[in-house]
Curated annotation (Swiss-Prot):
It catalyses: (7R,8S)-7,8-diammoniononanoate + CO2 + ATP = (4R,5S)-dethiobiotin + ADP + phosphate + 3 H(+). One of its GO terms (molecular function) is ATP binding. ATP binds at residues 12-17, 50, 109-112, 170-171, 200-202. This is ATP-dependent dethiobiotin synthetase BioD. The active site is at residue 37. Catalyzes a mechanistically unusual reaction, the ATP-dependent insertion of CO2 between the N7 and N8 nitrogen atoms of 7,8-diaminopelargonic acid (DAPA, also called 7,8-diammoniononanoate) to form a ureido ring. It comes from Streptomyces coelicolor (strain ATCC BAA-471 / A3(2) / M145). Pathway: Cofactor biosynthesis; biotin biosynthesis; biotin from 7,8-diaminononanoate: step 1/2. Its cofactor is Mg(2+). Disulfide bonds: none annotated.
Length: 238
């Protein structure tokens, strides 16, 4: 099944911009792409959410949400506060499966980190990936503190028998500090997975045309790009 689940080590690590970059690179390669947001929180009914931002940046991707809730909280908490039925992992998996019959690639973007709860029963994005038997791309931050959250997420994925094809740094700084430079080597070591890209900080503020043109250069060949981890490390490592 052509489904890739995208999660992060936490909030604000660049998941949506990375999702847009993966979509843009796949579209540039001639594939049809759908982006499914499992649960959108923190936006009103008439506001653009993460899926719409992906479409704005990436281009002609099909976008969908399973549910959205107004409070900027974990999906389970936001659903409870709104008095609404929470999202169930089975719903997300069903929606992704349907999209997969009509598209070459389906990107399922989570909310927050891997184990953020969808419902009172403890359903998470990890359960969605398990139901779909889909690989999980992990978006990480560049700097100090990322090694612990990255390793914890990688361990959880493997404990569930889920595939971790690689990591993408969601916001590579223009002037990386020593920790960020060292992490280029340390992130693959602690996670047991290769670096598959680094999206520059501020990429989401580019014009859609500039974003689409640049996206393949931020991602490695397994993600339809031309980025080379060794060359990047030679330029930016300590």
């Amino acid at each position: 099944m052509p489904v890739l689940v995208i999660t992060g080590t936490g909030t604000e690590v660049g998941k949506t911009v990375v999702t847009a970059a993966v979509a843009a690179a796949a579209l540039a390669g001639g594939r049809t792409v759908a982006v499914l947001k499992a649960a959108q929180t923190g936006v009103g009914p008439d506001e653009a959410g993460d899926a719409q931002e992906v479409a704005r940046l990436a281009g002609t991707a099909t976008v969908a949400e399973v549910a959205r809730f107004p409070d900027p909280l974990a999906p389970g908490t936001a659903a409870r506060r709104a008095g609404r039925t929470p999202v169930r992992p089975e719903e997300v998996a069903e929606a992704a499966t349907k999209l997969a019959t009509e598209h070459d690639l389906v990107l399922v973007e989570g909310a927050g980190g891997l184990l953020v709860r969808f419902d009172a029963e403890g359903g998470t994005l990890a359960d969605v990936a398990g139901l779909l038997d889909a690989p999980v791309l992990l978006v990480t931050s560049a700097g100090l503190g990322t090694l612990n959250t990255t390793e914890l997420t990688a361990r959880e994925l493997r404990s569930r028998g889920l595939e971790l094809p690689g990591l993408v740094i969601g916001s590579w700084p223009g002037a990386p500090d020593l920790a960020a430079r060292c992490n280029l080597a340390d992130l693959p070591d602690v996670s047991g997975a290769p670096l598959l890209g680094a999206v520059p900080a501020g990429a989401g503020s580019l014009s859609p045309a500039a974003f689409r043109s640049a996206a393949p250069h931020w991602l490695a060949p397994p993600l339809d790009g031309t980025w080379d981890a060794d060359a990047f490390g030679d330029r930016h490592g300590p």
